[in-house]
Amino acid sequence: MAKESMKAREAKRAKLVAKFAEKRAALKVIISDVNASEEDRWNAVLKLQSLPRDSSSSRQRNRCNQTGRPHGYLRKFGLSRIKVRETCMKGEIPGLRKASW
């Protein structure tokens, strides 16, 4: 189980990403715009750098919904490999069963 503080930190990051998403996107459009002046582009870069680090979506980490485990995360289920196996063996995931050939 992950520490509660780690889960809380990820939740905080998710809120910051949602809060600053539009602002970051607008600044990135200005930065990548070839027709914008160098001064405007530079100012956009400075404004982007002044935003909180945790507002970047690349700082988010996928975590298991049940345990908070960061490694072995399966996007399709939102769970770690361990919890997917446990729930599969109990028959709690419809249509999923152990492979045998």
UniProtKB/Swiss-Prot annotation:
Coiled-coil annotated residue ranges, if any: none
Pfam families, per the entry: Ribosomal_S14
Disulfide bond residue pairs: none
SUPFAM superfamilies: Glucocorticoid receptor-like (DNA-binding domain)
Keywords per UniProt: Ribonucleoprotein, Ribosomal protein, RNA-binding, rRNA-binding
GO molecular function: rRNA binding; structural constituent of ribosome
GO biological process terms held by the UniProt record: translation
Top-rank taxon, per record: Bacteria
Entry's Gene Ontology cellular component terms: cytoplasm; small ribosomal subunit
Family, similarity comment: Belongs to the universal ribosomal protein uS14 family.
Stated role: Binds 16S rRNA, required for the assembly of 30S particles and may also be responsible for determining the conformation of the 16S rRNA at the A site.
Assembly: Part of the 30S ribosomal subunit. Contacts proteins S3 and S10.
Classification via NCBIfam families: PRK08881.1
Name by which UniProt lists this protein: Small ribosomal subunit protein uS14
Lineage: Bacteria, Pseudomonadati, Pseudomonadota, Gammaproteobacteria, Vibrionales
